Regions:
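Helix-loop module immediately N-terminal to the HCX5R catalytic loop
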Residues: 178-201
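Short secondary-structure transition/capping segments
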Residues: 194, 237-239
Length: 239
């Protein structure tokens, strides 16, 4: 069962499937993040109940760039590396290393797009995974905050910043004043350069990529929002 303790943190006990204390380390890491404090205990209970356990070998490709999204993953044992193939680097540009308690696979599920990177196990290990529909119901909806343009502008006036997650070529064609450009596939690599005290409003053309970016930031404890309708839906573009 998952409950709140007196300090405002989650306590975990008697999760279906059991396991050793060491085996639950990944669960503890997840529940200690600020983002998971926004998720109702009932959602978390259902989330852990519906997750499937998967064993992996070193060198195994869990997610391949260009494939359709089907699952959200959390590492429960071992480590993985995130790479992205580019025209200039066919072997893959290293974007991040992931360890126990860290997750991946969110972007394609939220944006309904293709996988934008490849995830390969660096060691033997284990994962838990959650199907797309369960992910959207239990995790995506509680963590994703949409804002209309008037509200977004109010937040900007109070110190929030636009985070444009389109490609640099799109950004150069047109962008909002003072917007910061961090393409979606670079979010994991660049997240440490962002100010954790600054609210960010993610934007893209339609809202698909920016919703994935806002979710990733929320997972990491940022105060993140996504512009409803994207730039196109709000007629924000070159004159």
């Amino acid at each position: 069962m998952i409950t709140w303790d007196q300090t405002g943190s989650y306590e975990v006990s008697e999760i279906a499937g059991g396991g050793s204390a060491d085996g639950d380390d990944w669960m503890t890491v997840l529940l200690q993040t600020k983002a998971f404090h926004r998720i109702p205990p009932a959602n978390l209970q259902a989330l852990f109940m519906r997750m499937q356990h998967v064993a992996c070998r070193a060198g195994e490709v869990v997610i391949k760039q260009g494939d359709d999204g089907d699952f959200f993953y959390v590492i429960t044992k071992g480590a993985a590396v995130v790479t992205r193939e580019t025209p200039m680097n066919r072997d893959g540009l290293k974007l991040a290393e992931l360890g126990v308690g860290e997750s991946f696979g969110e972007e394609a599920l939220i944006s309904d797009g293709k996988r934008n990177a490849t995830i390969t196990m660096q060691t033997d290990g284990a994962l838990v995974r959650l199907g797309k529909d369960d992910f959207k119901e239990l995790l995506n909806e509680p963590l994703l905050h949409w804002v209309e343009l008037p509200r977004a502008r109010e937040l900007i006036e109070r110190g929030a910043k636009w985070l444009d997650v389109r490609l640099p070529s799109e950004f150069e064609t047109f962008h909002l004043d003072d917007a910061l450009n961090v393409p979606l596939y670079f979010i994991r690599l660049k997240v440490k350069t962002l100010d954790t005290k600054t609210p960010y409003i993610a934007v893209c053309d339609t809202g698909r990529r920016s919703s994935a970016a806002a979710f990733l930031l929320s997972e990491r404890g940022f105060d993140a929002y996504c512009l409803q309708g994207g730039m196109a839906g709000n007629q924000l573009g070159p004159d």
